[in-house]
Amino acid sequence: SSSGVKMMGETYELDMRMNFAVPAMPDRTDEGKPTFSQAAQAIIKESGVNRGVCVVYGFGSGELAYELARQSDLVVFGFDDDKERVGKARKWLYGKGVYGTRVSVTLVEDMKSIPATGNIANLLVSENILTGKVRPGNAVEMNRLLRPGGGVAILGTPPGVPQGVPEQEIADWLAAGEIKNTKLPGGEWFKVEPGPMADSGEWTHQYGNAGNTTSSDEKLGGATQTDQLEVQWVGRPGADFGIDRQPRMPAPLSAWGR
């Protein structure tokens, strides 16, 4: 200022570009109902997925989503078409201190047409199927949300958990969408594991491959212009992959869908 008094302190830049960490859970998180705690534990163990994006297709009360976040490093997104159910779930999760950071839910008009890009879920579950309330939407839309070549859906009731939607109804639901699945031992549950995306490419070296061809052989799903493409993901977990040193930055690498 004109008086010579310093009005502002030092400016510090906090660069989060290389932070892949998920938001932390509250210091104190209480274990939920045994049904959801046991189910989440079994789902994580059977799927082998404990980090990345989890989609709850048929969100229900939000208690399964909470337990999955509590027992893992997953960021959980849910979809449900019942306004009252979504409102109650949001209020409950907000009280637990996790809503909007590790768990969130979107109210949708139709579970058969989720307003989200596909291929996003490392893990997909359904509380509504677990609790036996309803088979949400259809299996085709569920499968669209799963990441190809590594995504896993676990649907139904694990061993030791009270029965939800009957096994045959889940099997019929999957069969109607022609979704390949595996019946898991014990309980009444199924695993869905989509294979790799057809004609997808890989970028495994600085210049594409060991031959430095600068080509990934990616077919782009047949797209020939930019308006046929869509944004896959924006936000955390994620980073600016450019390491700011020297004149040339290492290329981000991708293999087997990752």
Predicted regions located by residue number:
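Extracellular/periplasmic ectodomains of large secreted or surface enzymes and adhesion receptors
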Residues: 1-59, 69-72, 94, 171-175, ...
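Conserved SAM-dependent methyltransferase scaffold
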Residues: 64-66
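A short SAM/SAH-binding and catalytic strip from SAM-dependent methyltransferases
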Residues: 121-136
